[in-house]
Amino acid sequence: MAIRTILRYPDKRLREPTSPVTRFDAALESLVQDMAETMYAAPGVGLAAPQIGVLLHLFIIDVAMGEDQPSELRTFINPEILEAVGDVRNEEGCLSFPGVHEEIRRAERVRVRAQDAHGAFFELEADGLLAIAIQHEHDHLIGRLMVDHLSLLRRRLVHRAMVKRAAADTAVI
């Protein structure tokens, strides 16, 4: 297992399209383990493969992260949101936008169909933080980012702040 580098906005690779996972093998299991180690080290509640530069239709979530609950790591491979119901606003952060937290509108409940790390299909109905995390991570798989849910003004402000931070990070190296 290894901790991978998380791409930060405005890295263009975060917008690239992903491909379906077609091989369920030891390499995929290793990737999922690396993603989990990376997510927990960050720390975060979710991580999509494109956030570490892997353009596959895959994300992981553990909404118990940081709470007094046992870990409940979930792997979603080739996920498809079948149903999205209701409306909720919630403050979200993103590992690709360190330090940024914005109020985002999402569906209150979702039903998703995906595969696990062994290729078995499953369906899951989710609400609360899990539903929000599923939608957030699924967005990464289609090149949609947290800022895309913001007003044009907020998007520009966040963009400027992240570009400035990226320049400062580069100057330090």
Where are these regions (language model features)?
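Positively charged
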Residues: 1-173
